[in-house]
Amino acid sequence: MQTRQNEAGFTLIGMLIAVGIVAILALIAVPKFTSAIASANTARIQSDLSTLNTAIAVYEIDNGKAPKEISDLKDYLQSTDIKPPTGDCYMEGKTVKLEATAYTIDQANSQALCNGKAVGAFYKEKK
């Protein structure tokens, strides 16, 4: 039987150390990635609700009453097919799974809602 000497290659210990380092880096990156998605979704909701609130205000000026549905704003928006993002977002300082599939209008307060909440409810708690 021949013995192999001076051959370059990876040892099992070396491979385990490399895999361990990659696993540690993944554990650090995944929560930051999840947080970034929730922040992006929150920013999108804030933007959509602000845009809808502006359209509602202009609609009220033109028509003297609040719109009943988002589709009533078709002359004031590029598209009335605005939908909330899916996944997590920050609502009242907590990370929550977004359940809304559409934005709605609160006629009593003349504002757009997502998950029954106004734009002011979507924020991340400051640390």
Region spans (language model):
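Alpha-helical hydrophobic helix detector
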Residues: 16-32
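N-terminal leader/signal peptides at the extreme start of proteins
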Residues: 1-10
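Aliphatic-rich helix starts adjacent to a transmembrane/signal segment
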Residues: 32-51
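Extracellular/periplasmic head regions of type IV pilus-like filament subunits
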Residues: 54, 60-127
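Conserved amphipathic alpha-helical interaction elements at protein-protein interfaces in regulatory
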Residues: 3, 39, 58-62
